[in-house]
Amino acid sequence: MKTTRRDATRSRHQRVRRKVVGTAERPRLAVFRSNQHIYAQVIDDAQQHTLAAASTVESDLKSSSGATCDASTAVGKLVAERAIEKGIKAVVFDRGGNLYHGRVKALADAAREAGLEF
């Protein structure tokens, strides 16, 4: 049976997750990318708790096109602002099995510019 793109992304994500673990001091910035939207969460894996989140599904970001680099930039800025409000300055980046390119890279760059360190 042929391996689909989704299956390849899942196996890459499992490989990445073996190496990337978020703690209370340095939580994990997890990115999920679908065809129409992009989601970002700051997660403390020890407590299994989401500390901050943002996505293009939210009403304040819904006006921007969900599947573009501009929308990803807006999500990156918003999740970084929400994390900094909660006192989080450093994170570990989890690209979620996606290549570090395009929308995922735009989100990461925007989060760095907004003040998150990774």
Curated annotation (Swiss-Prot):
Q: Keywords in UniProt for this one?
A: Ribonucleoprotein, Ribosomal protein, RNA-binding, rRNA-binding
Membrane as a keyword of this entry, yes or no, is: no
Keyword rRNA-binding in record: yes
Q: Any one cellular component term from GO for this entry?
A: cytosolic large ribosomal subunit
Q: Where is the composition biased (Basic and acidic residues)?
A: 1-10
Q: Where is this region: Disordered?
A: 1-20
Which molecular function term from Gene Ontology is one that the record holds?
5S rRNA binding
CDD domains cross-referenced by the UniProt entry: Ribosomal_L18_L5e
**What are its GO biological-process terms?**
translation
**InterPro entries the UniProt entry points to:** Ribosomal_uL18_bac-type, Ribosomal_uL18_bac/euk
One Pfam family per UniProt: Ribosomal_L18p
Renumbered to this chain, the Basic residues biased-composition regions fall at: 11-20
Q: Which NCBIfam families match?
A: L18_bact
- Quaternary structure note: Part of the 50S ribosomal subunit; part of the 5S rRNA/L5/L18/L25 subcomplex. Contacts the 5S and 23S rRNAs.
**Function text:** This is one of the proteins that bind and probably mediate the attachment of the 5S RNA into the large ribosomal subunit, where it forms part of the central protuberance.
Similarity field: Belongs to the universal ribosomal protein uL18 family.
Recorded protein name is Large ribosomal subunit protein uL18
Query: Which species?
Result: Acaryochloris marina (strain MBIC 11017)
